[in-house]
């Protein structure tokens, strides 16, 4: 800015026309896909648990395999729960299938990504970049090669990796929701017996929940 030389920084990419791949087309995955489409990014998704025909209602292309999505997507955004099936779903074998210009985004659960393999993929130039809001271990081990390289701004990783402390939601509106919604949930349960957004309903039922 001091030199007023717009040619000094490296060129950045254009998002329009790049393929946005969503793994896990639930509520958050769908909301993310809609935002990507607003930037004229073609969207495709992989989710074996979404009913057939849902892609027609959403207007997004569906892939029948994870490999197909990884082969084609310029951006891969993760939106699955952490289960035995999804743990380390992004690993050395899946990262090598991704395009060299691709970017991996994980705002879901840290255990979905093998960060040892991600370190190797970034350092080896197999993918262009990654952005993580979640990690398998939180807070992370500062001695882990990927975390250390990020913390010391090593040249090979500079500008290619973003890390936030499980706080991608952090905004004034997000903080207001964080305070209001739990209270609304408790009030609804105590006054109406309705249990919303519960991840352990089966366990509560075992102990006499009214849900």
Q: What kind of region is each of these model predictions?
A:
Residues 12-16, 37, 96-97, 155:
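Short, flexible hinge/linker loops that cap or flank conserved catalytic cores
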Residues 29-30:
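N-terminal Rossmann-fold NAD(P) dinucleotide-binding loop
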Residues 33, 37, 122-123:
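Gly/Ala-rich phosphate-binding loop of Rossmann-like dinucleotide-binding domains
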Residues 48-151:
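Rossmann-like adenosine-cofactor binding region
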């Amino acid at each position: 800015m001091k030199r007023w030389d717009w040619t000094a920084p490296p060129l950045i990419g254009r998002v329009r026309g790049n393929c946005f791949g969503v793994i896990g087309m639930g509520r958050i995955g769908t909301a993310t896909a809609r935002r990507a489409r607003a930037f004229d990014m073609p969207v495709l998704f992989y989710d074996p648990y979404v009913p057939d025909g849902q892609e027609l209602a959403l207007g997004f292309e569906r892939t029948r395999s994870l490999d197909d999505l990884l082969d084609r997507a310029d951006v891969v955004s993760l939106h699955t729960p952490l289960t035995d099936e999804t743990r380390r779903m992004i690993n050395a074998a899946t990262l090598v299938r991704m395009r060299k210009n691709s970017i991996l985004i994980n705002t879901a659960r840290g255990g979905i990504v093998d960060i040892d393999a991600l370190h190797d993929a970034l350092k080896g130039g197999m993918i262009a970049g990654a952005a993580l809001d979640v990690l398998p271990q939180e807070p992370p081990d500062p001695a882990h090669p990927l975390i250390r390289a990020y913390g010391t701004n090593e040249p090979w990783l500079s500008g290619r990796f973003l890390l936030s402390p499980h706080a991608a939601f952090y905004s004034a509106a997000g903080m207001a929701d964080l305070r209001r919604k739990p209270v609304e949930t408790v009030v609804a349960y105590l006054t109406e017996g309705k249990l919303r957004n519960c991840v352990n309903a089966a366990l509560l039922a075992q102990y006499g929940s009214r849900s």
